[in-house]
């Protein structure tokens, strides 16, 4: 296993992945409050009878940072620098369930402030995260699970060239119920070069038809 240490910061053009911080709380809360209807159908929820208590934002950041230092996850904030502007907090990319040994895999989740959607920010951020997992952590496989109705998120995995692997019924508790999810996979052996290179080829390919 290749070595790594948290915190980790990655950048490509106008997009930066950096550790989620306690001082992100105000902007995080403003985004979620302003765009609650955008997020609600896709947000994970606690099933009835869940034993674990909810956490404050600060507690969540502390817990995530501890897991990151132990090599179990990568909890990134996504910063975007608009043309002529200053970096803004635009969303999150979280790599979780990092497993080594005979599996060498992880899961990736993400969200974006709808004000910045459609600019290629999340595909770029996930490509950076995937390349880091493959090249630095020596992972073999990354899974992205998406509700079949989430067309915006499905567009992200299409741009990344992720392979559809199948549907998992009642896979995750989302928006108050156990929901089916489609699973998409990136594998180290299937990428011709970096995931970022593949994304840029797809983004700049000429239109067909």
Label the model's feature ranges:
Residues 1-27, 31-38, 75-209:
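Acyl-donor (CoA/ACP) binding surface of acyl/acetyltransferases
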Residues 20, 31, 49-56, 70:
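Generic, well-ordered alpha-helical segments
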Residues 31, 42, 60-63, 67, ...:
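Residues that form generic nucleotide/phosphate-binding pockets
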Residues 38-62:
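Conserved GNAT-fold acetyl-CoA-binding loop/helix
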Residues 48-50, 61-77:
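A short helix-loop-beta-strand connector motif used in the catalytic cores of GNAT acetyltransferases and
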Residues 56-60, 64, 68, 154, ...:
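Solvent-exposed, well-ordered amphipathic alpha-helical segments
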């Amino acid at each position: 296993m290749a070595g790594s240490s948290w915190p980790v910061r990655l950048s490509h053009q106008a997009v930066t992945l950096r550790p989620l911080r306690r001082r992100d709380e105000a902007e995080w809360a403003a985004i979620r409050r302003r765009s609650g209807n955008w997020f609600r159908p896709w947000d994970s929820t606690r099933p009835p009878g869940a034993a674990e208590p909810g956490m404050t934002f600060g507690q969540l950041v502390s817990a995530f940072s501890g897991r990151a230092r132990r090599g179990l996850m990568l909890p990134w904030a996504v910063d975007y620098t608009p043309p002529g502007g200053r970096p803004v907090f635009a969303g999150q990319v979280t790599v979780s369930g990092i497993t080594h040994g005979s599996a060498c895999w992880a899961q990736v989740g993400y969200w974006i402030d709808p004000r910045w959607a459609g600019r290629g920010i999340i595909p770029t951020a996930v490509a950076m995260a995937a390349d880091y997992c493959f090249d630095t952590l020596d992972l073999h496989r990354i899974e992205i699970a998406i509700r079949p109705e989430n067309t915006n998120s499905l567009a992200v995995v299409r741009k990344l060239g992720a392979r559809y692997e199948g549907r998992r019924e009642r896979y995750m508790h989302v928006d108050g119920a156990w929901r089916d999810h489609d699973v998409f996979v990136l594998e180290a052996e299937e990428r011709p070069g970096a995931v970022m290179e593949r994304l840029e080829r797809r983004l700049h390919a000429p239109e067909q038809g």
